[in-house]
Structure formats: C-alpha cells, structure tokens
Amino acid sequence: MKKKKEKEKEKQKSINYYIFFFQYTLVYNTIQINKIYKLFYHVFITKKKNYFSKSNYNSPPKSVFSSGRENVYLPEEYKKKIEKENQENLEILENSMKDASHSKTTSLPFSSSSPQSSSSSSSSSSSSNSSLSCSLIFSSTLSLIKSELIKDDTIKYSESDSKSDSEFDSESNSDFDSESESEYEYEYEYESKSNSEQPIINNYLDHTYIYNFAIVVKAIHYLHHFIKEMLKFV
C-alpha cells in the first residue's frame, strides 16, 4: 500500500513538473517570437515608403503592406489593465514553480485536480487528473500569451526615425516627375489621415502569416514533447 502511494505521489510530481515545463517554455518562446516579429515589422514594413520611392511604384500596391497602425496608440488605462493581468499571470507561474520545486503532491493552480481519496481509486483519479491538466492547461497558457502580445501592441517610432524617413522621402521623390510626386504625397496624406481615425487595433496578427506559422510550429513541437512525456505515466 505504501509503495503504491509513493509511486502515485512520484507520478503526480512528475506530471506537475511537465505541465509547468510545457506552459513556461511555450510562453517564453512566444515572447521571443513576438520580439523577432516586432523587429521584422519595423525593418520591412515601416520602411515601405523608401522602397516604393526607389522603385518608382514598380511594386505591389501600398494597401498590401499597409498595417493601419502607424498613428494608432493605446491609452494609459488600457496599458495599466494589460500590465495588471500580465502580473497576475506571472504570479501564477511563480507559484507553480515553487510548488514544483518543493515537490508538493497537489496540482498546479490551473490544473484543478482533486486529491486521491483511497488506494483503490488512486490510479483512476491520477489518470483523470492528468487528463484534466492536459485540457485545462491551454486556457491559462493562452491568457499569458494574449497578455504578452497585447501588452505592447503598437510600434513606437522615435523622432529621429521619422525625421530620417521624411528626409529620405524628400530626396528620393526628387527623381519623380511633378505629377507622380503630387500623386504620392496625396496618397500618403490620405493614408495617414485614415490611419489616425481608426480605432484601437487589438488584433496583433493582422497580416503576419510568418508569425502565425512560427507560433503553430512552436506549439506543436512543445505539445508533442509534452504528450510524449505524459504517456510515460499512463
């Protein structure tokens, strides 16, 4: 009886550890991918004016690359709300880490597993707890990912960047004839005006198929590893 209980305890410890490992690594890699996405966005998307002016409009239309986010900003109240939610989620992760390090038999805060009542139902309860943990792990993970993605939802530009862009545009536009130059200025003014009137954009994945693909690949990789480790205890 004691040996069975000890084995069940060891199983629960390992299950709790792998649940925490899966959630933590998925969130961490999501944050890293988000940073790479911001760099990609800033280098390739925000510099579209320079590319179009050099190529003399022999390129796809601007609407394909328009993000609609150049003049969009988040209010302070919304930022505080996101930071608060993010802090709460990080506290959940820290508490989970402490539980795993102290080797407690209780489940993680987001696993909602019940304690084992008797030795006869120990195996069935442990399997049900693991399945509940597997199914409910995604809700807290997705909330953490969402808070990280929306925490800094806009790309902020420094004055020096905007100045250099305008200087480059003025130099490159000198190569155009007067008609194409006036057309370019009119279209850019209209686009910036329409962007400033747009509401706050919370969907961070508006036109980034690369970002979506990277998230899916990472999620599948860690989910496969997580399931493979969990099957050892079944």
From Swiss-Prot:
Residue numbers spanned by region Disordered: 102-130, 159-185
Biased composition (Acidic residues): 167-185
Principal location: membrane
Keywords: Membrane, Transmembrane, Transmembrane helix
Keyword Transit peptide part of the UniProt annotation: no
GO terms for cellular component: membrane
Membrane-spanning residues: 13-32
Topology in the lipid bilayer: Single-pass membrane protein
Low complexity composition bias: residue spans: 103-130
Record's subcellular location: Membrane
Annotated protein name in UniProt: Putative uncharacterized transmembrane protein DDB_G0281883
Species of provenance: Dictyostelium discoideum (Social amoeba)
